[in-house]
Design a protein with these regions (language model features):
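Short pre-active-site segment immediately N-terminal to the catalytic Zn-binding motif
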Residues: 87-108, 123-132
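Acidic/histidine-rich, surface-exposed loop or edge segments in extracytoplasmic proteins
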Residues: 2-28, 86-87
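Active-site recognition of the HExxH zinc-binding catalytic motif
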Residues: 106-119, 137-141
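Glycine-rich, acidic and aromatic/proline-enriched surface loops and short helix-turn segments
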Residues: 118, 141-149, 178, 182
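Auxiliary, metal-adjacent structural segments of Zn-dependent hydrolase domains
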Residues: 24-86
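Pan-zinc metallopeptidase signature
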Residues: 169-185
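Post-HExxH zinc-binding segment in Zn-dependent metallohydrolases
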Residues: 37, 127-170
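Surface-exposed patches in mature extracellular/periplasmic domains of secreted proteins
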Residues: 42-62, 123-131, 152-158, 183-185
């Protein structure tokens, strides 16, 4: 049995941009690609489709001509994720298709993790508690690390601690999985 990823709706809100054109060249079937990466995320976070999985009914994924990289919004089963065509253009500055594909997959793994991950309970929220924030962002980057979404050990920040969130926490969480508890993620 496979994981239920929900319905994926892809919408290009920046079709006139160079970033949109580049995206469509590297990802010709966005909805299928997003579903494939969602299954990767689910298989990383959960042991089986029978686990108690955060339900996602719909993912509305958009390309947008805005600043930033990507972000997940929504909730209660209806998720939105945007990906910036400006970031796509910057990532493609050297005309390196493989590098851009690698970055696009890594960003998608991170944002999809936010859609399906469990959240800490009883300690506040993303905006009010640093531990909550560090866990949420660290776990999203841990899924990216665990699935080869960064350039290996060289991408691991030196120093810092897990409360730094993102990549620092992500590499630490994967280390915990590999060295202390195979069920950590």
């Amino acid at each position: 049995k496979s994981y239920n990823v929900g319905t994926v709706l892809f919408e290009d809100k920046a079709s006139e941009t160079k970033g949109s054109d580049i995206y469509h060249r590297i990802i010709p079937d966005a909805e299928s690609y997003i579903k494939e990466q969602a299954r990767t995320v689910l298989a990383t976070l959960y042991n089986s489709p029978e686990d108690s999985i955060t339900p996602v009914n719909k993912i509305h994924y958009t390309l947008e001509d805005i600043e930033g990289i990507s972000a997940k919004g929504g909730g209660n089963g209806d998720v939105t994720i945007f990906y910036s065509t400006r970031h796509i253009e910057k990532s493609f500055a050297e005309n390196d298709t493989a590098k851009l594909f690698f970055e696009t997959r890594g960003v998608l793994l991170h944002e999809l993790t936010h859609a399906y991950q469990l959240e800490p309970q009883g300690i506040g929220s993303y905006g009010t508690n640093r531990v909550f924030w560090a866990f949420i962002e660290g776990m999203a980057d841990a899924v990216r690390v665990a699935n080869g979404g960064f350039d290996g050990p060289n991408a691991r920040p030196k120093g810092g601690n897990y409360m730094d969130g993102y990549r620092t926490a992500g590499y630490f969480f994967v280390w915990l999985r590999d060295n202390k508890d195979p069920e950590f993620l």
